[in-house]
Amino acid sequence: MPYILSIDQGTTSSRAIVFDANGHACGQAQKEFRQYFPEDGWVEHDAMEIWNDTLAMCQQALRNARVEAQQLVAIGITNQRETTVLWDRETGDPLARAIVWQDRRTASTCEALRDQGHENQVRSKTGLLLDPYFSATKLAWLLDNVPNARQRAEAGELAFGTIDSWLLWQLTRGKVHATDATNASRTLLFNIHEQCWDEELLTLFNVPASVLPDVRDSAADFGTTCPELLGAAVPVTGIAGDQQAALVGQACFAPGMVKSTYGTGCFMVMNTGEAVESHNRLLTTVGYRLNGKTTYALEGSIFVAGAAIQWLRDGLHLIRDARETEALARRVGSAGGVYLVPAFTGLGAPWWDPHARGALMGLTRDTGIAEVVTAGLEAVCYQSRDLLDAMAADCGTRPTTLRVDGGMVVNNWLSQTLSDVLGVCVDRPVVTETTALGAAYLAGLGVGLYASLESIAEQWRCERGFSPALAEPERQKRYQGWRDAVARVCQTSRGAN
């Protein structure tokens, strides 16, 4: 039986899963790592810690699966996107901690570029907005704030990459500096229509081309691992950013199909086939690129989903474990007019307000822990409604089904409430960790284990479906309360700036 090792490097943990050819997980390992918050709005990771943890999890997953490295036909990598690493080509050491996608330190830089009239140029080339979420201003910040970094970069001594590139560099011991089109499309430096790094954008963000990785298909030859790392030289043949990998893992291969992943953040992606320009502040991005052909997608990004539950646990100590949230929500049924707007690092799509900060509204003397926790879960659903409404407006048709995945959707109350708030059917697959599965599928395509996307689609199975059970007037009433709460948060942020 051939096996594929899938590396799933996320925002809060590094995971490795061994899959067989039928998409069944045979063994896995996962480890959380430290988050750094040196200043307000700053979020950093230790890239070397990520690499060491990832390697250890790969080794542990193989042991747990009782699979030898020689039995692996390929490795797939999926990763937190936009997070920016700058390292020394000679030593392989990072010059500074990685700047995470959630980091907002370059908000003023983005505002200045918008004020100078560059947003339309950037959007037309990249499909993205001028927002600190993306890699370009993070990279420019590192070049300008790490001593001698810009001079060394221009001399060809430094390499930039998102986490996939960083892991690939380490896995191949510096032999391969590459990324795939999905990760490149999240940097603000990549022209998604011409499928290349864009010289005008490099000039705009003051980034030297010498630091950039080679861009390849999502299923391609990305080199071979150094044998001593896993016990054998294994080809790396699939790479995709986490949300695009989930699109593949959910087998959303037809235009109009939508998936939403619920982890640290929430990310909804619709396969559009061709590029669709959003008029509702969604992102036009690369869904995947296979055999040189690009399939495009619309994406809405929510910065805080599961992270709100982590905050309730670690910041407020209202719960000890995320699994407690379902019982608490069932006890009260709803948040009872309490709204948590989790804008801890700004608001993502479709609001895109980097200055917004979190708020808890509608509190009364009767409000208790259960209502606050339930408001945290409901916020995930309301933000998802924001995204689905925007996608429907852009595409002229509203999807009737949403395929969901990620750690949060094992919560049946959340999945049902999601269906109630959105007014569409919600399908949860047998394999909810579809991000890792998508990376495995891409690696399998790259090595010839799968003949086509159609053969992958045949493996998708629904574990449970949820249908709307909330009356339309109540659905609209609750959602309007959310819209009012967000409007107040945005109004406050404008007043503060």
Swiss-Prot record:
Its EC number is 2.7.1.30. Keywords: ATP-binding, Glycerol metabolism, Kinase, Nucleotide-binding, Transferase. One of its GO terms (biological process) is glycerol metabolic process. GO terms for molecular function: ATP binding; glycerol kinase activity. GO terms for cellular component: cytosol. Transmembrane segments: none annotated. SUPFAM superfamilies: Actin-like ATPase domain. Pfam families: FGGY_C, FGGY_N. Sn-glycerol 3-phosphate binds at T11, R81, E82, Y133, D242. Belongs to the FGGY kinase family. This is Glycerol kinase. It comes from Alcanivorax borkumensis (strain ATCC 700651 / DSM 11573 / NCIMB 13689 / SK2). The lineage of its organism: Bacteria, Pseudomonadati, Pseudomonadota, Gammaproteobacteria, Oceanospirillales.
